């Protein structure tokens, strides 16, 4: 960016705060000074900062600032269930996936995805955290019930042996993978 003549500023999300009003909405930084108008924002957001960071991005968006990843796309990508629903809507094949609210549905959920082995995922986890391979039905029941006892939202997915423990990440830019 600098080689192309752009000026770059780095802002720590946790040190930004906002002013909302009808005439002069603003984003401020650290010592209280308003951030000067920006041409673009390239957000890098940790999962724990999603709610607050997306609120800031929505204000940037409403001020007409281009955001490389807009708030809606970040929120969609952080919600595994919603992401899977969006992929299905576009005709993308996904592993058979189950989602339920009650531990009473555990056995039906396990059978729905083809039985064990299966994958149990926390909806909020990232980078492989909160992902468990349950090799037996008993292990699956234990993991699901443990997560449910913590009121955690989980997905149960069929295990795809051919994936060899890896997932595939693709970027789509201007309609091309």
Which positions does each model-derived feature cover?
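Phosphate-binding site of ATP-dependent enzymes
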Residues: 132-177
């Amino acid at each position: 960016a600098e080689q192309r003549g752009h000026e770059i500023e780095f802002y720590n999300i946790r040190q930004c705060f906002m002013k909302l009003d009808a005439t002069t909405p603003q984003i401020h930084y650290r010592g209280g000074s308003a951030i000067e108008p920006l041409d673009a924002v390239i957000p890098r957001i940790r999962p724990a900062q999603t709610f607050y960071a997306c609120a800031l991005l929505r204000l940037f968006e409403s001020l007409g600032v281009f955001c490389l990843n807009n708030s809606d796309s970040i929120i969609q990508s952080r919600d595994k269930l919603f992401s899977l629903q969006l992929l299905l809507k576009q005709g993308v094949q996904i592993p058979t996936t189950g989602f339920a609210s009650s531990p009473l549905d555990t056995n039906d959920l396990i059978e729905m995805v083809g039985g064990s082995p299966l994958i149990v995922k926390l909806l909020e986890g990232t980078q492989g955290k909160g992902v468990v391979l349950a090799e037996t039905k008993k292990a699956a029941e234990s993991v699901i019930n443990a997560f449910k006892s913590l009121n955690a939202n989980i997905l149960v997915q069929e295990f795809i042996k051919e994936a060899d423990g890896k997932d595939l990440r693709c970027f789509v830019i201007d309609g091309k993978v």
